[in-house]
Amino acid sequence: MEVIPAIDLLDGRCVRLYQGDYQQSQVFSENPVEVARQWVEQGANRLHLVDLDGAKAGKPVNLSAIEAIVRAVSIPVQVGGGLRDRSSVAQLLNLGVNRVILGTIAVENPQLVQQLSQEFPGQIVVGIDAREGKVATRGWLETSEVQATELAQNMAHLGVAAIIYTDIHRDGTLKGPNIPALRELATAVNVPVIASGGVSSLTDLLSLLALEPSGVTGVIVGRALYTGEVDLSEAIQAVGQGRWQDIPPDLGSSAFA
């Protein structure tokens, strides 16, 4: 399972929000590029960037920080936040971003999601952010009547590369992922699902391994990395590729004596 560090950008700085509340932001670094490099050094294979200003504005805002991070690291970078038209998506992909994450337009303009998935195959991911099973939009400032699982099925049919599922009530809270909701969603679709929100410990990450057969292929970790509750290199060793439970024991010659 892929462990993906999150870097949330607000005013060019690396922050974390509590349950998506912009009034409850905590600055973790003035230099997001250094943060990105740190996660790469600890073994990250992918970075997850969220343009929080962009999510509110409905268009990319932290472009200079995003471009600087993409240039500074040699691993794929995925970006979400405020991507609501083709030009914004193309702009980020032209900067060297590997995958873009669409949220609001998945609810408001599914036809555009289909067009983008066809134009940029493998590079369009849909972020489904849910409050009590219903999809939130516009930087989590609004909640729709659309059910998360229903939207996930529609998006899978449209050809998206993956779905990121965030439980808003758990995001930034360190209360653990919503395992039942993740299982329901992953079982309902045939595209990879990435879990996001609430991871607080290695135990939480290990609990997600049970969902791998259902199609949960990755997990985004934010606050727990910044507070030190989760050590990235340890997490990758525990649940990532080549994790200890996948490695056969070294029997040694004595086993055959």
UniProtKB/Swiss-Prot annotation:
Q: Tell me which residues this entry annotates as catalytic.
A: D8 (proton acceptor), D129 (proton donor)
**Pfam families assigned to the protein according to its UniProt record, in alphabetical order:** His_biosynth
Pathway(s) of this molecule: Amino-acid biosynthesis; L-histidine biosynthesis; L-histidine from 5-phospho-alpha-D-ribose 1-diphosphate: step 4/9
Q: What is its EC number?
A: 5.3.1.16
Give the record's GO biological process terms.
L-histidine biosynthetic process; L-tryptophan biosynthetic process
InterPro entries, per database record: Aldolase_TIM, His_biosynth, HisA_bact_arch, Isoase_HisA-like, Isoase_HisA-like_bact, RibuloseP-bd_barrel
Molecular function terms in GO for this entry?
Answer: 1-(5-phosphoribosyl)-5-[(5-phosphoribosylamino)methylideneamino]imidazole-4-carboxamide isomerase activity
Domain of life, source organism = Bacteria
Subcellular locations according to the entry = Cytoplasm
UniProt key word Hydrolase: no
Q: Which SUPFAM superfamilies does the record cross-reference, listed alphabetically?
A: Ribulose-phoshate binding barrel
Q: Name one GO cellular component term.
A: cytoplasm
- What is catalyzed by this enzyme? 1-(5-phospho-beta-D-ribosyl)-5-[(5-phospho-beta-D-ribosylamino)methylideneamino]imidazole-4-carboxamide = 5-[(5-phospho-1-deoxy-D-ribulos-1-ylimino)methylamino]-1-(5-phospho-beta-D-ribosyl)imidazole-4-carboxamide
Q: Which UniProt keywords apply?
A: Amino-acid biosynthesis, Cytoplasm, Histidine biosynthesis, Isomerase
PANTHER family annotated for this entry?
Answer: 1-(5-PHOSPHORIBOSYL)-5-[(5-PHOSPHORIBOSYLAMINO)METHYLIDENEAMINO] IMIDAZOLE-4-CARBOXAMIDE ISOMERASE (PTHR43090:SF2)
What's the family?
A: Belongs to the HisA/HisF family.
Q: Any idea what this protein is called?
A: 1-(5-phosphoribosyl)-5-[(5-phosphoribosylamino)methylideneamino] imidazole-4-carboxamide isomerase
User: Which organism encodes this protein?
Assistant: Gloeothece citriformis (strain PCC 7424) (Cyanothece sp. (strain PCC 7424))
